[in-house]
Amino acid sequence: MVQFYLLTLVFIVVDRFAKLFAINVLRDLPNGIVLVPDWFKLMYAENLGIAFGLRLLPPEGILLLALAISAGLTWYVWISQNRSPLFILTFALILGGGLGNLIDRLIFGHVVDFIYFDIYQGTLFGKYVSLWPIFNIADACITIGACLLFFFHDKIFNPR
């Protein structure tokens, strides 16, 4: 269990430092920092919703849902007898990412996003679209954890 909590803490700390950089540096740069022209930049954004900026619930509902999921995930790992490295990594990524965004919601009332891949911006069927959202380290942790869960389900839950 110690490894799980330490790894979760590492993901939270990395996310916090990255978001502090976004707040202290990127917020004052309207065009962000271009790392690969026309493709990848760091750019400050405030996300009031959940994934892809969707606002399916009011802010209080999102906060309560995030708290419930984090508590449920912590409880599940606690009662599980599975201590395989892949199990610990997968759930530490998901919990660390979830708690990283939860901390933002508690402090700021929104999530700080700053990683932007400019895959396509333009008109599609007469409507302006941007095909990739701005995200953060916590979102990446959740996504990587979910992908591990999907692709390595049998290895995670049936370790040898």
Swiss-Prot record:
Its EC number is 3.4.23.36. The chain crosses the membrane at residues 59-79, 84-104, 132-152. One of its GO terms (cellular component) is plasma membrane. One of its GO terms (molecular function) is aspartic-type endopeptidase activity. PROSITE patterns: SPASE_II. GO terms for biological process: proteolysis. It is found in: Cell inner membrane. It is a multi-pass membrane protein. Keywords: Aspartyl protease, Cell inner membrane, Cell membrane, Hydrolase, Membrane, Protease, Transmembrane, Transmembrane helix. PANTHER family: LIPOPROTEIN SIGNAL PEPTIDASE. This protein specifically catalyzes the removal of signal peptides from prolipoproteins. Belongs to the peptidase A8 family. This is Lipoprotein signal peptidase.
